[in-house]
Structure formats: structure tokens, C-alpha cells
């Protein structure tokens, strides 16, 4: 039986997380994680000490037609930045965890929009 694309993506994500956990400096940085489905896009901020989600945004919150495109993914960045400001996390340094996805399309658009807001990763 042939293994699926998601199986390999998850295996890649596990390898990336293992490298992050082995580096002492990266253990103390907040992590911005993403998940994308065919219809929606999700972004989370993880606490480095408890490894729990602090806040999240998704295209489920917005009520515009099709939400699985580049425009809607990049429009989530200002929403996430507003939530960072509420939690006084805008001056922290972050790790961008792409979740095993390739850095193009929606992932790249979201990351560039976050960088435009002033988030450092």
C-alpha cells in the first residue's frame, strides 16, 4: 500500500520539531504553527514552556466565500498580530513552524504578511 502525501508531511514535521527541541535557544521562543486544509487556513501561537496554544486565528472566523486561497491566508496576519498585541507578545522573537508544508502559496503569503506587520522570525 502506498503511503499518502499527508503521511510524509507529518513525518517531515516530526523531524523539524525534533531539531527545534534540540536547540537550546529555540526552546525559549514562541512558535507560530500553521495548518491548511483545502477549504481553510489556521494559524496558532504556542507557548514554549507549556507547549500549549495561546491564541489562534482561522479563516473560519471570516465570512467571505471561498477561504482556502492566498488572499484570505494573508488577510489573517493582521488578525494574529492584533491578538499578539493584546497578549504583549509583539516584541518577542518567533519560530515559524510551517508544519511540513512547502514554503510557497498560502504559507508564503501568510509569512510575508506577518513580516510586514513587524513580527520577527
UniProtKB/Swiss-Prot annotation:
InterPro entries the UniProt entry points to: Ribosomal_uL18_bac-type (IPR004389), Ribosomal_uL18_bac/euk (IPR005484)
The keyword Glycosyltransferase is annotated on this UniProt entry: no
Give the record's GO CC terms.
Answer: ribonucleoprotein complex; ribosome
> Highest taxon of the source?
Bacteria
Q: Name one GO molecular function term.
A: rRNA binding
Keywords from the UniProt entry? Ribonucleoprotein, Ribosomal protein, RNA-binding, rRNA-binding
Gene3D superfamilies membership: 3.30.420.100
One BP annotation, GO: translation
How is this protein organized at the quaternary level?
A: Part of the 50S ribosomal subunit; part of the 5S rRNA/L5/L18/L25 subcomplex. Contacts the 5S and 23S rRNAs.
Function, as annotated, reads: This is one of the proteins that bind and probably mediate the attachment of the 5S RNA into the large ribosomal subunit, where it forms part of the central protuberance.
What family does the entry list? Belongs to the universal ribosomal protein uL18 family.
Protein name according to UniProt: Large ribosomal subunit protein uL18
Species of provenance? Mesomycoplasma hyopneumoniae (strain J / ATCC 25934 / NCTC 10110) (Mycoplasma hyopneumoniae)
Amino acid at each position: 500500500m502506498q503511503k499518502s502525501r499527508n503521511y510524509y508531511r507529518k513525518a517531515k514535521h516530526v523531524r523539524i520539531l525534533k531539531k527545534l527541541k534540540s536547540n537550546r535557544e529555540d526552546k525559549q521562543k514562541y512558535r507560530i504553527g500553521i495548518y491548511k486544509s483545502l477549504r481553510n487556513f489556521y494559524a496558532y501561537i504556542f507557548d514554549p514552556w507549556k507547549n500549549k496554544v495561546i491564541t489562534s486565528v482561522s479563516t473560519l472566523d471570516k465570512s467571505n466565500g471561498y477561504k482556502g486561497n492566498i488572499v484570505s491566508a494573508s488577510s489573517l496576519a493582521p488578525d494574529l498580530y492584533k491578538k499578539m498585541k493584546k497578549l504583549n507578545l509583539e516584541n518577542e522573537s518567533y519560530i515559524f513552524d510551517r508544519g511540513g508544508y512547502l514554503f510557497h502559496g498560502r504559507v508564503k503569503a501568510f509569512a510575508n504578511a506577518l513580516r510586514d506587520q513587524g513580527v520577527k522570525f
